[in-house]
Amino acid sequence: MNIRPLHDRVIVKRKEVETKSAGGIVLTGSAAAKSTRGEVLAVGNGRILENGEVKPLDVKVGDIVIFNDGYGVKSEKIDNEEVLIMSESDILAIVEA
């Protein structure tokens, strides 16, 4: 993928969500909600502070994150792959193995 996010932006590929319940029932429509977990594919250089310094991001390429799938998250198709572009502040947590 040939994309470089700017500043505090992060490119995330959404993880596939389970389409079966624990009891084996196939979920469809609103019951099969979109996942709010994904893998970080690219990160920007960092957030520019008021004093002009750049604060590096806490997330890095390869991290699995939980994110807020809200207003500030933009969905784009790049190289025939659906990705999300978001600010680091839209990321709620890093999943540690």
Curated annotation (Swiss-Prot):
Entry keyword annotation includes Manganese: no
Alphabetically, the GO molecular function entries are: ATP binding; identical protein binding; metal ion binding; protein folding chaperone; protein-folding chaperone binding; unfolded protein binding
**A GO CC annotation given for this chain:** GroEL-GroES complex
Q: Where in the cell is it found?
A: Cytoplasm
Keyword terms, alphabetized: Chaperone, Cytoplasm
Q: Where are the transmembrane segments?
A: none
**Record keyword NAD present:** no
- Coiled-coil residue spans: none
- Tell me, in one coarse class, where this protein mainly resides: cytoplasm
Task: List the Pfam families hit by this protein, alphabetically.
Answer: Cpn10 (PF00166)
Residue positions of the PTM N6-succinyllysine?
Answer: 34
Q: Which InterPro entries match?
A: Chaperonin_GroES (IPR020818), Chaperonin_GroES_sf (IPR037124), Chaprnonin_Cpn10_CS (IPR018369), GroES-like_sf (IPR011032)
Q: Which GO terms describe its biological process?
A: chaperone cofactor-dependent protein refolding; protein folding; response to heat; virion assembly
Description of how activity is regulated: Activity of the GroEL-GroES chaperonin complex requires Mg-ATP.
According to its UniProt entry, the function of this protein is described as: Together with the chaperonin GroEL, plays an essential role in assisting protein folding. The GroEL-GroES system forms a nano-cage that allows encapsulation of the non-native substrate proteins and provides a physical environment optimized to promote and accelerate protein folding, probably by preventing aggregation and by entropically destabilizing folding intermediates. GroES binds to the apical surface of the GroEL ring, thereby capping the opening of the GroEL channel. Regulates the ATPase activity of GroEL.
Q: Which PANTHER family match?
A: 10 KDA HEAT SHOCK PROTEIN (PTHR10772), CO-CHAPERONIN GROES (PTHR10772:SF58)
- Tell me its family: Belongs to the GroES chaperonin family.
Q: What does the annotation say about its assembly with partners?
A: Heptamer of 7 subunits arranged in a ring. Interacts with the chaperonin GroEL. Can form asymmetrical complexes, composed of one GroEL and one GroES, and symmetrical complexes, formed between one GroEL and two GroES oligomers. The asymmetrical complex is the functional unit. It was suggested that the symmetric heterooligomer may represent a transient intermediate in the chaperonin protein folding cycle. Another study shows that the symmetric heterooligomers are substantially populated only in the presence of proteins that cannot be folded by the chaperonin.
Descriptive protein name: Co-chaperonin GroES
